[in-house]
Amino acid sequence: MDFEILKTDEHTKARAGKITTRHGVIETPIFMPVGTVGSVKGVHQRELKDDINADIILGNTYHLYLRPQTPILEKAGGLHKFINWNRNILTDSGGYQVYSLAANRKIKEEGVKFKSHIDGSFHVFSPEKVMEIERSIGADIMMAFDECTPYPCEYGYAKRSMHLTHRWLDRCIAHLEKVPPKYGYHQSLFPIVQGSVYKDLRTQSVEYIASKNADGNAIGGLSVGEPVEQMYEITELVCDILPKDKPRYLMGVGTPVNILENIALGVDMMDCVMPTRNARNGMLFTAKGIINIKNKKWEDDFSPIDSDGHTYVDTYYTKAYLRHLFAANEFLGKQIASIHNLGFYLWLVREARRQIVAGTFLTWKTKMVADMSNRL
């Protein structure tokens, strides 16, 4: 993997760059649609490529391990071929999913024992096991196995968890050397900075992570309930210490406003289920503000969904029609809204990149943050 910074903003810490892998170029800053089980909910791969123009999507190790399972993925030739996607893929290690299974998992030094949400069977994820699964999946970027702590989190637990994540990272790195890639191309391992909201722990963790000289680095354990200003504070602290010549990935973030604020702090990559999850509930993000398409006010509004939008659905369908689809509980409505929201998120990061290159990012961001917060 190669990463090149093409321009840094003079007034913020924002960067415009590009990541190059076997599966193509990823222009940064980038937002990555989440395709947990090998699909972005409600969106065809062709729409992701041609309309939304996603350079990279996510898959999830936990979910893909349970279904369709790694033997099927290996027979298919990896996840790229299984889902017919010839662009980049990043896989989460499953650490966050294990965190979310709090009542059905047990964490020990050797790994995590958890109960499948599908059939109740028990499984063990160790750093070594996760690396083997991620080799079978074949993502271009794969995450190290970590423990994601909740918020709030007691200091002592956060410290013990951070050190456990570091030890697990060392085991991930050691095991990867023994398990070569299965599909003929390099896979980059990104370690994950942890430490909850404690600045001293985050500093320890980021220094440890930076010392590994990985292809890129991730910031985990945020956007789990902490105040947004605390998220920004920790993100800035970590970005200031992480190597400048490696991409920085903030995991699980966030709203369109969060996206721009974190770009300004030096983040290059982000992902979140919000654009598709909120779309399925009738919330549309636009440059002028947020639309709840279920509201009665849109019942006879025959204007385009978003006259400034950048996907075909934005001007092809009207607000009144989309509201009707939601009222009738037609799945097409959720699909249209999902395409719109993802298209908006991808436009937002592309435009942020253009503004960074032009030297006008801060002025543009300030206006966008205000406008996008409106309720229409």
Where are these regions (language model features)?
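C-terminal extensions of enzymes
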Residues: 1-18, 26-32, 41-42, 146-153, ...
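Glycine- and acidic
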Residues: 151-155, 159, 216-222, 331-334
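HAD-like aspartate-dependent phosphatase fold
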Residues: 92, 166, 218-220, 356
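Glycine-rich phosphate/ribose-binding loops and adjacent secondary-structure elements
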Residues: 175, 179, 184-305
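Conserved, mostly hydrophobic/aromatic
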Residues: 24, 57, 92, 134, ...
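Structural signal for hydrophobic packing residues in well-ordered secondary-structure cores
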Residues: 138, 169, 173-176, 180, ...
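A non-catalytic, amphipathic alpha-helix used as a structural packing/dimerization or gating element
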Residues: 129, 133, 137, 160, ...
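Non-catalytic, usually N-terminal nucleic-acid engagement modules in DNA/RNA processing proteins
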Residues: 1-182, 296-299
